[in-house]
């Protein structure tokens, strides 16, 4: 199963009391429900592609309203593998929609009903229902960090974003072609949201993966930095050796001042060491990195004069 499926499976096993079941069910039916007329009575169909979510809807309706619920299974068309699960209720449809704040004075409302989010537990339950209905989260092992909840109605998405931001999640909403989404892009905020709606095992797995990814990225950055520094050191050393060899051909290293002569010999003999290490090899006593750099720069300047044909005074 995918990371998102594992998470939804975990969320559907959370035990809730009737009050919080009502809040969760309100989100599920508002987002995935449809009303139809059959044999002169209203029928509520709540549709999902996730079998565990279908079982959750079934159990929540039974818990809150204690009525008969059917579960139907449909095959998707056009070679799609997933089944479609439909939870259907044929009685008390008007009462259900009224009590869940989906129907107000005979009119369907798309905004979150304040009665469904009266306290912290109900808010968490509503968000859990919203994620079960329209949520997805990228696998943190293979993708960029991204969690989103799709809703058909923009004002409902705005309400979800406001609700999530009560918990400082930095949620944003965006209009899409057939609806709108609320999304999180920051790994820390995604982790907080998973915990908020009760997905503690998913949160722990997400955090484990995030830590490994962050460590791997840090190591890669360190290796890249050290490689770049090493390449820079090697390039500089090669140029210094070329300059010293040119000086030896044209003037002779033995004719250089003593302080330049020794550092020239040391550099040719130790081409892969750093300036600091080179300074520690000087026979007259350790000299600083800047001191070594100053002497090598003098040698490069002398070689440049030779290359340009300038007169050299020793």
Curated annotation (Swiss-Prot):
Keywords, ordered alphabetically: Cell cycle, Cell division, DNA-binding
Job of this protein: Involved in cell division and chromosome segregation.
Lineage, top ranks: Bacteria, Bacillati, Bacillota, Bacilli, Bacillales
DNA-binding as UniProt keyword: yes
NCBIfam families: DNA_bind_WhiA
Native source organism of the sequence: Staphylococcus carnosus (strain TM300)
A GO BP entry: cell division
InterPro entries: Homing_endonucl (IPR027434), Sporu_reg_WhiA_N_dom (IPR018478), Sporulation_regulator_WhiA (IPR003802), Sporulation_regulator_WhiA_C (IPR023054), WhiA_LAGLIDADG_dom (IPR039518)
Protein family per UniProt: Belongs to the WhiA family.
Superkingdom, taxonomy of origin: Bacteria
Cell cycle in keyword set: yes
Alphabetical list of SUPFAM superfamilies matching this protein: Homing endonucleases
Location of the DNA-binding region in this protein: 274-308
Gene behind the chain: whiA
Pfam families named in the record: HTH_WhiA, LAGLIDADG_WhiA, WhiA_N
Name of protein: Probable cell division protein WhiA
PANTHER family, sorted: CELL DIVISION PROTEIN WHIA-RELATED
């Amino acid at each position: 199963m995918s990371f998102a499926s594992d998470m939804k499976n975990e969320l559907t096993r959370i035990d809730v009391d009737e009050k919080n079941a009502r809040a969760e069910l309100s989100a599920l039916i508002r987002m995935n429900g449809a009303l139809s007329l059959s044999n002169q009575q209203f029928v509520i169909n709540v549709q999902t592609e996730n079998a565990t979510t279908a079982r959750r809807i079934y159990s929540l309706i039974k818990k809150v309203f204690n009525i008969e619920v059917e579960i139907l299974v449909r095959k998707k068309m056009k070679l799609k593998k997933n089944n479609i699960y439909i939870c259907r209720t044929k009685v008390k449809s008007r009462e259900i929609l009224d009590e869940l704040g989906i129907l107000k004075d005979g009119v369907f409302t798309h905004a979150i009903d304040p009665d469904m989010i009266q306290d912290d537990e109900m808010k968490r339950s509503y968000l859990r229902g919203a994620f079960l209905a329209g949520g997805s989260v990228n696998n943190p092992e293979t993708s960029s960090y991204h969690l989103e909840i799709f809703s058909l109605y923009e004002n409902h998405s705005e309400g979800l974003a406001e609700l999530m931001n009560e918990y400082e999640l930095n949620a944003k909403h965006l209009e899409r072609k057939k609806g709108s989404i609320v999304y999180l892009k920051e790994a820390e905020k995604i982790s907080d949201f998973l915990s908020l709606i009760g997905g503690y095992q998913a949160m722990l797995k997400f955090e484990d993966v995030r830590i490994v990814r962050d460590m791997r990225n840090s190591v890669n950055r360190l290796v890249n930095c050290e490689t770049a520094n090493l390449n820079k050191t090697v390039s500089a050393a090669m140029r210094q050796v070329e300059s010293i060899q040119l000086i030896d051909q044209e003037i002779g290293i033995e004719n250089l001042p003593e302080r330049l002569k020794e550092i020239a010999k040391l550099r040719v003999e130790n081409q892969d060491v750093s300036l600091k290490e080179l300074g520690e090899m000087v026979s007259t006593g350790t000299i600083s990195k800047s001191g070594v750099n100053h002497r090598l720069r003098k040698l490069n300047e002398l070689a440049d004069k030779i290359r340009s044909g300038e007169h050299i005074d020793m």
